[in-house]
A protein has these predicted regions:
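Metal-ion/cofactor- or nucleotide/acyl-coenzyme-handling active-site neighborhoods
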Residues: 1-192
């Protein structure tokens, strides 16, 4: 189903600010939060997290959120989390419920938004780099969860560079500080 609204995808990069999120929340857009985005955004339309370990750690805080939830790893039948399927690393999937992974949740969220029918995707918090020693806007994940080292970000960028974005889909990177240069960049204030 094609969506007429734009969707803002909120990742966890260290340049993400509460002010940017509050600005987005006032716009007529849908919002797809990745992982801990629920902690900074109170108006999620969707929540996506790949890893079962993340869901286990956060379940008591996210289980009652009114947004639609998606995961890539098996969720052991958790009610309210739709299970997506891993369809490989590179490219994009156009078959529901399969996702190409790009080996990171940000890439998977883009594929999910396209599968959901969105034609205008706005990226926020897609730093794809460390910033002043930080990996995420909230600091590090707990030790039992993943915190990507810098070399991993560099490897992930290659998947984005070769992402075959359909001609009728527009992806704009509104991230304040980013190493992701394959999509046009614009500040939020120029988009709304």
């Amino acid at each position: 189903m094609e969506r007429t609204k734009a969707i803002v995808i909120i990742a966890g990069g260290p340049s993400l600010t509460k002010e940017d999120v509050e600005y987005v929340e006032k716009q007529d857009v849908d919002i797809l939060g990745i992982n801990d985005a629920y902690r900074i955004c109170s108006r999620l339309t969707y929540l996506y997290a790949c890893d079962r370990r993340w869901w286990n750690w956060h379940w008591t805080r996210v289980s009652e959120l009114p947004c639609k939830k998606f995961a890539l790893e098996d969720m052991d039948g958790r009610i309210g989390v739709e299970q997506m399927e891993n369809d490989g690393f590179d490219g994009l999937s156009f078959e529901w419920p399969k996702l190409r992974t790009g080996k990171n949740s940000g890439y998977q969220a883009i594929n999910l938004a396209i599968l959901l029918g969105y034609k205008k995707l706005i990226l926020l918090g897609y730093d794809m780099q460390h910033n002043n020693g930080k990996v995420h806007w909230f600091g590090d994940h707990p030790k039992t969860l993943n915190n990507a080292p810098l070399k991993v970000f560099k490897a992930w960028l290659g998947f984005y560079d070769t992402m075959p974005v359909p001609e009728d889909v527009e992806i704009i990177n509104a991230t304040r500080e980013t190493a992701l240069t394959c999509f046009p960049r614009k500040p939020l204030e120029e988009l709304f």
